[in-house]
Amino acid sequence: TKLTQTFRSNQGIANVASGFIQKNKSQLQKVVNAIDKTTSKVVEINFLTKAQEINEYLTRTIMEINNASASSGKKKSIYILGRYKHHKPNLDSILPFLRNCTFEFKTIHSSKGLQADYVILLGLNSGGSAFPAEKEDDPLLNLVLPQPEIHNFAEERRLFYVALTRAKEKVY
C-alpha cells in the first residue's frame, strides 16, 4: 500500500524525511503530504561533539521549549532519541524546572509508532557506535538475515526516517 498522507509530522519534516529516504532508488518513490503545511524552521542542525556542549545544548533547548509552552498554555512533549541506550544524557538537574513540557530518552528503534511534539536526535556523527552504525553485524546473524542491500546504509536510512518522523513540530 502506498501511504501518501501523514497526520504526525508537518510538511517540512515530511519533505526532509522523504527526500532522505528516497535517495535509495530501491525505495518506493512517493510524495508525502502532511495535514500541517508548515515548512519553515522545522529542522535545526547543530554539530556538537563534546559531552559538555551537548548537555548544555540539550538543557538550553529543553528550557526554551518549556518556556514557549508556558506562553502557549499547552504542555509539550520531547523525545531525545539515540541509536543506542548509552547515548542517554543525564538531565536530572533540569527536571525540577520543567512545568510545561516532558522529555524522555528513547532509542530510535523503541520510538517506532510513537510521537512527540519535538525530537532531539543524538549521536549523528561517525564512529563505531554512532548513527549510522558502522559496526559489522555478527557473522552468525548474517546467516539468518536477508541478503545485503545494494544501497549503502539502506536500513540505517529507514531508521533515520523513523527518527525524523516521530516529531510533530520540530526536529533538532
Model-found features: residue ranges?
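Conserved helicase/translocase motor-coupling segment
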Residues: T49-L114, Y118, G123
